[in-house]
């Protein structure tokens, strides 16, 4: 039996003691991740991600096919493929801060560091021309924190300076189990079931930093939206070897990912604090958060010394994630 084990480690890009924060590892740190399911991760092995995430036409006997299930059929008899990838990130966000007059005061920076297992994949043969693959990898990540101190005269003169903070964290993980079959020489077909699970939390805090006695009983508002995701989707894929010999290989590939509603359970809570009491409001429901329907097509050429690939992807996301968009007033 041939056993191929691939373990890849990406070194940590940097470490800032002043901004390092504990807690769960994060792979995104951007205000744009506050929408939908967050920032989509580049999937695949390290080699695939190093080439920009190409892999729909990737066909190898020594590397798991993590993007196209049709590639599972390339697994050699009496072999077993196992891949582990470790990723390190130093993520930093910078925001301009302005004073009450609207003039720029300083550049505020914040960052997070993480080291985490990125993907785990195994692939093995079931019969001649028939293979199975199982993989676990991150699908999307949420990580952001933004703050604003409102010192306008009409606010500060009534209740004091008001501080607003928006933050969020979480991720969605993808587990894929599929089968690839080569019914004809150089032509393969694959199907895979995908399970998505994870939790995403969005938080909002509004508080009076310098409460003026007697002017208002309002102190703070704390809100949290938590999404619990657990849903199945599926994928189909094709691969065709136009050229396949000992010197070079030219492969065409395509996949279709069925998206649609994730229908996560969402729990919304609101805590109102004032000088006299604390009120808590909580409600649960089902969100319309969804994944896009996706079509990929590509071609890959490689020989012992050279490899190149080109891919095209079309995603139809719909409007199911628009509920996360919030309208905000002018904060100067």
Predicted regions mapped to residue ranges:
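Bacterial Sec-dependent N-terminal signal peptides
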Residues: 1-22
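Outer-membrane beta-barrel porins/channels
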Residues: 18-50, 121-332
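N-terminal, post-signal peptide beta-strand-biased segments of exported outer-membrane/organellar beta-barrel
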Residues: 17-138
């Amino acid at each position: 039996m041939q056993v191929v084990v691939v373990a890849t480690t990406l070194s940590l890009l940097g470490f800032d003691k002043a901004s390092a924060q504990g807690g769960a590892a994060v792979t995104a740190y951007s205000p744009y991740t506050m929408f939908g399911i967050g920032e989509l991760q580049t999937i695949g092995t390290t080699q695939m991600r190093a080439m920009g995430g190409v892999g729909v036409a990737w066909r190898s006997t020594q590397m798991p096919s993590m993007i196209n299930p049709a590639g599972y059929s390339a697994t050699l008899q009496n072999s077993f493929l196992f891949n582990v990838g470790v990723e390190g990130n130093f993520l930093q966000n910078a925001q301009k801060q302005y004073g009450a007059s609207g003039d720029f005061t300083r550049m505020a920076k914040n960052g997070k560091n993480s080291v985490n297992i990125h993907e785990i994949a195994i692939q093995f043969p079931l019969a001649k021309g028939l293979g199975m693959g199982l993989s676990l990898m991150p699908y999307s990540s949420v990580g952001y924190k933004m703050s604003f101190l409102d010192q306008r005269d009409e606010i500060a003169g009534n209740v004091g300076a008001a501080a607003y903070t928006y933050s969020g964290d979480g991720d969605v993980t993808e587990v894929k189990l599929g089968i690839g079959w080569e019914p004809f020489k150089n032509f393969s077909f694959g199907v895979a079931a995908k399970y998505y699970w994870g939790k995403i939390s969005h938080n909002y805090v509004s508080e009076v930093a310098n409460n003026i006695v007697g002017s208002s009983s309002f102190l703070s508002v704390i809100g949290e939206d938590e999404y619990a995701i657990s849903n199945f989707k599926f994928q189909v894929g094709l691969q065709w070897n136009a050229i396949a010999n000992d010197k070079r290989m030219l492969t065409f590939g395509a996949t279709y990912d069925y998206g649609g509603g994730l229908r996560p359970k969402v729990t919304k809570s609101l805590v109102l604090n004032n000088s006299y009491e604390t009120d808590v409001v909580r409600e649960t429901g089902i969100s319309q958060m969804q994944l896009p329907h996706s079509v990929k097509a590509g071609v890959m050429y490689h020989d012992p010394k050279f490899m190149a690939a080109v891919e095209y992807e079309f995603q139809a996301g719909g409007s199911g994630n628009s509920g996360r968009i919030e309208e905000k007033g002018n904060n100067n």
